[in-house]
Amino acid sequence: EKKSAEAATVLLEEFCSLHGYGKPDFGAYQSFFEAWITTPHAPEKSSNYRRDLDLSSGVATVRYELDGASHLREAFCSDPAGVAVVRLSADQPGQITFILDATSLHKGVEVTAADGELMLAGRVDNGKGNPPGMRFEGRIRVRAEGGTVAAAGKALTVKGANSVVLLIAGSTDHKLEHPDYQGGDPATINRATLDAAAKTSFDDLLAAHRRDHGALFTATTLRLDGVSREDLPTDRRLAEYKKGRADRGLETLVFDYGRYLLIASSRAGGLPANLQGLWNNTNSPPWMGDYHLNINLQMNYWPAGNTGLSECFEPLARWVKELAKPGAQTARVHYNAGGWVAHHVANVWGVTAPGPKRGVHMLEAESAAFICQNIWDHY
């Protein structure tokens, strides 16, 4: 009867609540913890500092020279091993000395150091008080060649090592399984993960990571003829490009970077890429770092099949399959209908109801069909 505005008002009042998206009980994609490496190196005394990220191998490196020694740091996140790996080395013996500690934005975390491991454990604020929310633990195991490793309060000290490998594991007790979403003990999971990784040398961990990452990254190659300013660092290339100077190599680099982000954010067995990706240094990210089903989540995965990253689609398909379970309840309660439904926003806890009362866009009941189009197109 051409009363869409009136209908929207009724729906907002009857269907939407004061809970959900943007509220403490909805949750957010939050920072885990930060590991800090404090060295005695004076920045003003170092030279030839360089850092880079190799998109094709997924390895980040830092190089610099200090007091006649060349220092190298290599870092990567291994999907096969389930750990982040950092190696600090130098071309002269006994050069690696640092303090390792950890901090978190979450309140009430417990940090301990013992037996060559640094551990940080806590529970998130669920917006409801007691009992608190999801449990989490981060654990770093230190393997040193030469030198000493010792606990010093809530930190580890490494002195005079030739090289050091840090194996980093992080887990929570969340499990993507409706209705309780309850997984195992994060400390137990981390110990098992680190024990398995510790049986493998750094070189073998790196080789396995390169094979795994490289198989995905090299599945598609984009080549554009024309000028390529590969002699310049990336920040300079971006600045020059904004001035209108052609750089076809930069355009292919951005294409490769987009694929790299999806490879890093969406691997089998994990959660799909959210509005924030993996990189987040706050407990209150934009849009809660959730899943917007009105187009954002769909856009994250549009390039997957087209650019040779079909393997990265699995987390989205599995998440949607689990979302359909609470979505069936929402369809019955809100619409007296079969099938399943979701609305504007969702999260990792199966939220499918409309709301809160923030506008008519919260009533987008077609969101389930929209995200299923991704699955239809993929399969």
PLM region spans:
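Aromatic-residue-lined binding/catalytic grooves and analogous aromatic/hydrophobic interfacial grooves
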Residues: 1-359, 366, 377-379
